[in-house]
Design a protein with these regions (language model features):
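Metal-dependent active-site segment of extracytoplasmic phospho-/sulfohydrolases and closely related
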Residues: 62-63, 69, 102-138
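Substrate-binding rim/cap in mid-to-C-terminal beta-strand-loop elements of soluble/periplasmic
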Residues: 108-116, 142-231, 283-287, 292-293
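Single conserved hydrophobic/aromatic residue that forms the stacking wall/gate
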Residues: 1-12
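Active-site His/acidic residue clusters
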Residues: 50-96, 134-136, 140-144
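Long, internal low-complexity/basic segments
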Residues: 62, 250, 255, 261-262, ...
Length: 355
């Protein structure tokens, strides 16, 4: 992969990128190829850019939003001598532990910067990730106690850790079990910055600078929950695997419509009879219809008595489907399938012939 540096701009650029088209209001520079040797220390490159960004925001006396995405712990891991040297016979570390040590140092550098500049008590800091463990590439991809992993509709593919720090606002040491989605961060942050109505405003249409936006956000403002003032405002989670709605969670109950017996790299099978799981009672999804599943015979009896609940999931799916009429999906889900690649090539050829 190549690396790129992007800067937002007030000027709309007419430059064209071969893959993405018109650049728009940003400046893009080629930052070179990300060779395996460079992968050893690219996180330090990213960290330095982040620290410089904080310095500039402080100098300009402006609020800032920093989204820092180190490569650790994403496959494939190439360790620098410093972190490779942390592995020894006494600790028996794999590349996972050594890579996590590097990630810990990166996070520590950012927290130290905030403290040194007197910003730590007035800054919301969140540590989280975008998907569950990619356990089929262990040890790089990590491990999880939950069923499945990245790319699946099982809990191992969707559940992620989240740690939040906001001194004076978020109670220290508090553990919250309310349902929250990554889509909730945007409305929550905007509410914390002073606008709790951003979802409703964008739904109606909102002017931001010279740009007009009219979009449907699926996120909820969760400031009350994170501040310990109330429960989660979210009751439902939609589990999309690429473009397929594979499961829905409503409070404690999860309704799963597909199976992926070989994980993300295998085929997706549509189930004639959905699997119902009470995630409070069975968070690891060990029971179900699958041959050999624990308690599978007793599960059928339990399923019959809980079948009435499917009316709830039908209503939720109908609600989200209705939003797609005015706000249709902006793009198809990604796929490594050859048919999808052929479709992309054909689309590109048609676009070229129309010029």
């Amino acid at each position: 992969r190549d690396a790129a540096c992007d800067w937002s701009s007030d000027v709309c650029s007419s430059d064209l990128m071969p893959r993405w088209g018109k650049v728009g209001k940003q400046k893009v520079e080629d930052a070179g190829t990300l060779y395996p040797e460079r992968m050893r220390t690219v996180d330090e490159e990213i960290r330095d850019v982040a620290l410089s960004f904080i310095d500039k925001a402080k100098k300009d006396d402006k609020p800032f939003f920093l989204w820092l995405n180190p490569t650790r712990m994403h496959v494939t891991t190439h360790l620098s001598p410093k972190y490779e040297g942390m592995r020894n016979a006494d600790n028996d570390w794999t590349i996972q532990e050594a890579g996590m040590a590097q990630l810990d140092d990166i996070v520590g550098d950012v927290l130290k910067k905030l403290k040194d500049m007197g910003l730590d008590d007035n800054t919301i800091v969140v540590f989280t990730t975008d998907n569950g463990a990619e356990n089929f590439t262990w040890p790089d991809g990590g491990q999880t106690p939950f069923a499945g992993g990245k790319g699946t509709a099982l809990e191992g593919g969707f559940r992620v850790p989240a740690i939040l720090r906001w001194p004076g606002k978020v109670p220290a040491g508090k553990v919250e079990n309310g349902i929250m989605s990554g889509m909730d961060w945007f409305p929550t942050f905007v509410a914390a910055a002073g606008n709790p109505n951003i979802v409703e405003e964008l739904l109606k249409g909102k002017q931001v600078g010279s740009q007009s936006y009219k979009v449907h956000l699926d996120g909820y403002n969760q400031t009350d929950m994170i501040m310990g003032k109330g429960p989660s405002t979210r009751h439902e989670v939609f589990y999309f695997t690429e473009g397929t709605l594979s499961a829905v969670r409503i409070d404690d109950f999860k309704y799963r419509f597909t199976d992926q017996p070989d994980g993300w790299i295998g085929s997706t099978v549509k189930l004639d009879m959905p699997v119902l799981t009470n995630l409070r009672l069975d968070p690891f999804e060990r029971t179900g219809f699958t041959k050999g599943a624990q308690g599978s015979y007793q599960y059928m009896n339990w399923f019959l008595y809980e079948f009435w609940r499917f009316q709830f999931v039908q209503k939720e799916v109908a609600k989200v489907a209705a939003t797609a009429i005015e706000f249709p999906p902006m793009q198809k889900g990604a796929s490594f399938n050859l048919d999808a690649v052929k479709e992309q090539i054909q689309h590109a050829m048609l676009s070229q012939s129309g010029k």
